[in-house]
A protein has these predicted regions:
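SAM cofactor-binding core of SAM-dependent methyltransferases
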Residues: 56-125
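Conserved beta-strand signature within the Rossmann-like core of class I S-adenosyl-L-methionine
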Residues: 168-181
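Short, glycine-/aromatic-enriched active-site segment of Class I SAM-dependent methyltransferases
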Residues: 185-200
Length: 220
């Protein structure tokens, strides 16, 4: 999942006027870590491209959430694989409920740096263990979003999760980003190198969402 890496990354967003993440700048000031090496790498072509791609992605996701809340103001906003992302807060309309989901160690850090606010809950879980479904009250509607998350999932894991969500949250909306097979191979060799992904071909990739994902389930 893509998290703020350095103040330089935030500066790229600001210079391009694409995405202003003041929370990212605030968090970097709170984290006791030397970002100098990351800062040096942030000026490379791939890193600059990645920064702009992330900025556009966050804009797109925020638009989808805000658009859904315009019609369902009391709905829940669920950030799948949240890391230290604050998109839910950025889209808060004053009446929605925000859930942030991630692994226990990630949520432990989040609770320190981004304690849950009003109408917000941080949930420790494995997204593939659908026990977390029981903690989401979707009676007023639900929009789920996954930002830079499904790159780490096998295609079958995404399919199983999506079908299970369709069963448990009828009428809900799921928004996520994805890349085609060629791009996933490139990402695995660069940004996801630390994940030690071996069989890239088994991981989630999409070239044509309508023709590839729609057949998974008639409700999609």
């Amino acid at each position: 999942r893509d998290q703020p890496r350095s103040r330089g990354l935030g500066d790229v967003y600001k210079r391009q006027n694409l995405y202003r993440d003041e929370m990212a700048v605030h968090l970097i000031d709170q984290i006791d870590y030397d970002f100098s090496q990351v800062e040096k790498k942030s000026h490379g072509l791939m890193q600059r491209f990645g920064s702009l791609e992330v900025a556009m992605r966050q804009n797109d996701l925020a638009w989808e959430v805000q658009n859904y809340l315009a019609d369902h103001p009391d709905a829940v906003v669920v950030n799948l694989g949240c890391g230290l992302d604050s998109t839910g807060r950025a889209c808060d309309n004053g009446s929605c409920k925000i859930y942030n989901l991630d692994f226990p160690d990630v949520i432990a850090v989040r609770n320190q740096l981004l304690p849950a606010g009003d109408r917000e809950e941080n949930i420790s879980c494995n997204l593939n263990d659908t026990e977390w479904f029981t903690k989401i009250d979707a009676s007023e509607g639900a929009i789920f979003f996954a930002s830079g998350v499904f790159y780490y999932f096998l295609t079958e894991q995404v399919r199983t999760l999506v079908q299970a969500m369709a069963d448990s949250f009828p009428g809900g909306v799921l928004v996520f980003d994805a890349a085609n097979r060629t791009a996933v191979k490139m990402i695995a060799k660069t940004w996801l190198r630390s994940a030690k992904i071996q069989d890239v071909g088994a991981y989630f990739a999409v070239s044509d969402a309508k023709s590839e994902i729609s057949p998974w389930d008639s409700r999609l």
